[in-house]
Amino acid sequence: MKKRCYILPSILFLFFFSYGRILLYLQKDIHVGFTALYAPTLKDIGIGILILLVCYALSKANLIASYVLALVLGVFHLANVEYIYALDHVVNLKDITMASDKEFIAGTLFHVSFPVYSILLMASLMASIFFLRKLPLFKLKTKRYNLLAFAGLLILYLVIAVQSSGDWKNGNFVSASIRNSVALLTFNEEALTDYPPDIERQINTSQQLKDGEYLLNNHTGKKNILMVVMEGIPGAYSPANQEFLNIPNDIKMSSLDKIKDHSLILPNYITHNNQTIRGMYSLVSGDYPKMDASTPKAYEYLQKDPSYREELLPKLLKNRGYNTAFIQAAELEYMSKGDFMTAAGFDTVIGGESFRNPYVPFGWGPDDKAFFEQSQKYIDELNGKGKPWFAAMLTVGTHHPYAVTDDYAKQYPSRKAAAVAYLNEALSGFIDYIDHSSFAKDTLVLFVSDESHGVNDQPYGSNWGVFAAYSPDIDGQIINDGVYGQKDILLSLLDYADPDLDAYTTGRSVFRKYTEDSPILFASHYNGDIFYSTEKGTVYQVDNSGQLYSLTSENGELFSSKYGRTSLSDSTLKKKILTYKNYIDKSSAGDQKIVITKDKEIPLTDGGEAVVTDGQFITLPAESYVDIQVDYDASSMAAADWLVLKFEDYSGHKSVRMIDKQNRSGKITFRFYNEKVGYGYAFNLKTALHSNDYSGADKAIRINRITVEFSKTVSAASPSPAASAGMSAGPTPSASSGPEHVEVVDMDAGNE
């Protein structure tokens, strides 16, 4: 009887482990029948049993190690529950290294969506190991045999995981994470480089502006353009989309009803991939972002000689007499959006550091209400410079863990729903500001999204963006039901702003109605799926296992309440789609050096810490030395001042360097060896001033350039004596005798 009680915690763990799926269905209000639920639940139970056996075998060899493994697997399961709840995707292991995950995990720890469930699952798992160890499940005599049993079970689990479904609705969460990660890391792109000569036409369009009927017949002259980009908002939240497509949603952005009488709506609007920097690049470039998680095209754009860069939307509008400004809530250093937007042609670039006194403290930047209210000053200043003008705004409050107070969140079923409601209120006030402004009658306003944080029961809901245009030029509400994507915005705004634009220009404008469809591609780098459509209502999907499917909407639109899904064996079509993906993903930089930022002046205050750069999302080549070089000048420091330069990446490399009067200018290189291809690599660089100077003089550090360089062999330079692994407590003597300090920090020699 006593031994039977020993298995009770294991039974409870299996129940809680499999109940996570049901919990998500209930909280996300997804209705499924028993037939759709029992098979995935049985998989959860089977994987749960295997996890218990793996931990049991390890406990016989090393009890502490088994608890550590159980902790990792339990937290990984709970992280997937949070990720699915927030973004409708499982965690991809490559994303663990991303800077965004640090904020995601930190936010989750303070705002766990299912605290009781999390505690019960972890407690039952730990108790299972404790009590199962008392049972003679494996009668193995030596530690060696127990380790072999553990290794065999672990390999079996990994094999099952790799072969399982990558969709959380059909497979176990942890297994799906492992499967998707392995699939993305082993994707073979080398065999898909036979590009047809007309590939641009095949992935974009052969249509010309003149092929579409212009829908804004009342539009005259050059008007101001304001583009409001809302973090992660899917098209499912648009009241007009819900009504037109007959797809109800518990979340509705009623503020968009205020523009109903003078609006143009795109119900079939695509965001081409996940991640803000990719969406923003597509909006201002008229180009696809990469369909995978490799180095964003925005960084590759920065590497090009300025005289050879393609002219992007801000520059093209500036050439037509527009004053331009980019205003975002997040700090400009993150993802180097400040550098990219400046290179893109914006005259003025404003980031989160320019916003004060938020209503809700939030790590990513000002909350949406504070952002919209304080942005009015910058828009008024831009308007005062003369017309016409173009401004792009980017919110951040609907990014996980969401900029709302706990009391506000309690009024809604989830923090995400609360954050969208808060954005809705803030946007309503901002629309009122526009309506009462002096520029209201002369301005086109676009409400769009940078990406989509997912929609329940939508096979590509992570690519359903919102688009609503608002202008006195628009009489009533126009529904343009064609399929458009972020890449179409550039030409659309030129079509709007420039009446002399050549009608024979190749491309599509959202302000025109076309009788024929055009090709479009989109993807989710969370799970590696790629989608391709040439006809509205039919989408081809290649999942990360290489299986080809046809998705057919019931209503004939791109988005529907029901879809038919058919497995196809058309190898020619599959190869064509993957070839398109590879063509879009190929690097345009060509060299082995990436410039992260340059010519940046960072003001310093005593005791204050400033972010120099963060969130780069770079692809690291295999078997290469990685050199991250910081070229700096801190000559404005007083003799008694010293600086701390803190380097940390999400692979565990850390270093703290001291800068004082002896090494106030120079180059510090952080070097490490990278064994395997790494996607989404990011590092954080901060600086802090320690001053004994009370003169009140302004002080700053100038970052001449930060570069990331790859090489197969280590350069001739070797780590300086000052680049030891130990962390210094204060200023250290310079490692070079000349006026410019040169230091190479070997990150593989130690973490500090």
Which role does the model predict for each range below?
Residues M1-S181:
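Transmembrane and membrane-interface helices of multi-pass
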Residues G608, D631-I668, N674:
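Extracellular ligand-binding interfaces
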Residues L332-M335, D475-D606, N704, E709-P721, ...:
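Membrane-interface soluble catalytic domains
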Residues F670-R702, I706:
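Extracellular beta-strand ligand-recognition surfaces/modules
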Residues T597-D599, T605-G608, E623-Y625, K661-K667:
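Solvent-exposed, conformationally flexible loop/turn segments
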Residues S175-T505, R512-H525:
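Soluble catalytic regions of membrane-associated enzymes that act on cell-envelope
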Residues S624-V626, A638-L643, Y681, K699, ...:
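Short beta-strand/loop motifs in extracellular/secreted proteins, especially
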Residues L317, D614-M637, G666-N674, I706-V708:
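Extra-cytoplasmic beta-strand recognition segments
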